[in-house]
Regions:
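Radical SAM enzyme core and accessory elements
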Residues: 1-21, 27-28, 48, 52-54, ...
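Acidic, low-complexity intrinsically disordered segments
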Residues: 2-241
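Flexible glycine/acidic-rich beta-alpha junction loops that bind and position SAM and/or redox cofactors
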Residues: 25-29, 91-96, 127-133, 212, ...
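Radical SAM [4Fe-4S] cluster-binding motif and immediate context
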Residues: 34, 181-348, 353-355
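A general structural detector for well-ordered alpha-helical segments in enzyme core domains, enriched
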Residues: 42, 70, 74, 101-112, ...
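Non-catalytic positions within long, well-ordered alpha-helices that form the structural scaffold/packing
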Residues: 134, 243, 300, 371-372
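Short, electropositive alpha-helical surface patch
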Residues: 138, 144, 265-272, 359-377
Length: 520
């Protein structure tokens, strides 16, 4: 553990506490408990600089008095009087503004500032845009993958003008160039500070960036033409260290794992040296898998058994519009093969309704087939979303958002000014029609025992004994979904089925953290 030494050379602070925040209200329990890679990477950076640092996973769900108690004890232990609080949030817009879904985050941040007035508050994440004026005094915002920018900020080093600005509320913001990879993939060391146990799921990257450039995607490192992989020895050491904590479940957070064979080679070389069988989940492109079926066996061998497949559409022309290649009959044959021969896989199909020129009738007909034939374990459904508050500054907006008319999308301007997504129409659909169709497909899925359960949800349930990577386990869940298909709010059943597990996980983790801080 690093204690105060030479770090007082920085004007920013003399320690840093990273808090993992979530947008979901406490009464709508989290459906997974994956350890967030962001704050592990940030913590690793701070440790490397000699800056005392600690992490607080799932801080939104701690009792707030416990948050203050832990911070106070830790700061006194390391002798810090000018702490920096780094709030990390995945996919959350306006987390401290009036449109937030989790107002208790505002209460928490203000309570921290009240108790530690000589502190600074910074926010990072894939898209930490302030849609409305923050109700918390913030000192900086770090957009996207910004470890290197935070490091320079912490050390008072110059930041390139093209990577900084000030937003409309006067808060300094820092962001990356598009498709320029500024740092290595994160393969974290597993510090005692994380208080891990055998129910945890830890994350890592084999590569930062994605070589594809889908028109609906706003990922800042898409279209990457100069990729490089994580160090194989580091990945092996990570798996072995995790297993020393009893951990056998992992999440690869690459944007698209199966984009290139070298990543398969890396993971096969690593997993063949392990003395345990890992269970891995992550993102893969289904069209690539369908055209390279040899990937299926390699994924199975390495333990990559949980998949979120960005299929998006089965419509050949619509798939061309997003720079993918749908071959309807071929897709269904591959899905049938995986259903029949890989029952120990959890596969979630991610579908976007409304991509032109696909009609909602076509979307629903396809859904009747993939749901009726049980080709997915879960479904991830969205109407086509055109973000209003994407990063913009770094030109990382999706092509659909940059130039919608080019793709036959007309923005109507009829949405509320604070809505996250623009209202739209096309020659074949509209945002409203796509939303209605999406809800119809979701209800169809529920009636057939297929819910909005992604592989991270499934792996989390598996980690606490529900065995969702078995035929019997999936059948039990399907029976529960069918029995509750009448519930109007599709998330209610899943909240009820997860909440007791989630509350127990958080309580046990907080207890471990409180015991840990007493040992320092």
């Amino acid at each position: 553990m690093a204690y105060i030494n030479e770090i007082n050379v920085t004007k920013q602070g003399d320690s840093i506490i990273f808090l993992d925040l979530n947008q979901s209200p406490a009464e709508r329990a989290q459906s997974d408990h994956i350890r967030t890679l962001g704050i592990m990477g940030l913590h690793q950076s701070a440790e490397r600089m000699g800056l005392p640092s600690t992490t607080m996973h799932w801080a939104s769900y701690w009792d707030q008095e416990d948050v203050i108690k832990y911070i106070d004890k830790w700061l006194k232990t390391v002798g810090s009087t000018r702490p920096i609080f780094g709030f990390s949030n995945l996919f959350g817009l306006d987390i401290f503004g009036s449109t937030t879904e989790q107002p208790s985050n505002i209460t928490l941040a203000n309570k921290i500032k009240e108790n530690f007035p000589d502190s600074k508050l910074i926010v990072g994440g894939p898209n930490p845009v302030c849609v409305t004026k923050p109700l918390v005094k913030l000192d900086a915002l770090f957009y996207g993958r910004a470890l290197w920018l935070m490091e320079r900020w912490l050390q008072d080093k110059p930041i390139p003008k093209k990577n900084e600005d000030v937003n409309e509320f006067g808060i300094p913001i820092f962001f990356n160039d598009v498709a320029v990879i500024p740092e290595d993939p994160i393969v974290p060391d597993l510090h005692a500070d994380y208080c891990l146990n055998e129910q945890d799921i830890v994350t890592f990257e084999t590569r930062l960036g994605c070589k594809f450039n889908c028109t609906f995607c706003g990922y800042e490192f898409r279209g990457n033409k100069d990729p490089y992989n994580a160090n194989e020895d580091h990945v092996l050491a990570f798996f072995e260290e995790a297993h020393s904590h009893g951990i056998t479940r992992f999440s690869i957070v690459d944007d698209t794992f199966n984009e290139e064979k070298s990543k398969f080679d890396l993971m096969l070389n690593v997993t063949r040296q392990l003395d345990f069988q890992p269970r891995i989940v992550g993102f893969n492109r289904f069209d690539v898998l369908a055209h390279k079926p040899d990937q299926i066996g390699m994924l199975d061998e390495m333990g990559f058994h949980g998949h979120l497949w960005g299929i998006e559409t089965f419509h050949p022309q619509a798939s061309k519009a997003i720079r993918k290649t749908a071959r309807t009959d071929k897709f269904f044959k591959v899905l049938e093969h995986i259903r029949d021969d890989y029952p120990h896989w959890w596969v979630t199909g991610s579908i976007i309704v409304g991509i032109p020129p696909e009609t909602t009738d076509y979307s629903y007909e396809m859904a009747k087939r993939y749901i009726g034939e049980g080709l997915f374990s879960g479904v991830n459904l969205h109407a086509l979303m055109v973000r209003k508050f994407a990063e913009g500054i770094s030109e990382s907006d999706a092509d659909f958002a940059k130039d919608p008319m080019k793709y036959g999308i007309t923005l109507t301007g009829k949405e509320h000014k604070d809505d996250m997504y623009a209202d739209w129409t096309t020659a074949t659909s509209s945002y409203r029609e796509a939303e209605i169709c999406k809800d119809r497909i979701l209800k169809l899925g529920l009636r057939n025992g297929i819910g909005p359960v992604n592989p991270w949800n499934a792996l989390s349930k598996d980690a606490i004994g529900h065995e969702l990577f078995t035929t019997a386990g999936k059948e039990r869940m399907a029976a529960g979904v069918k029995a509750n298909h009448h519930i109007d709010n599709a998330k209610t059943y899943f909240t009820e089925s997860w909440i007791s597990d989630w509350e127990l996980l958080i309580r046990n983790y907080v207890n471990r953290k409180m015991e840990y801080v007493e040992t320092l």
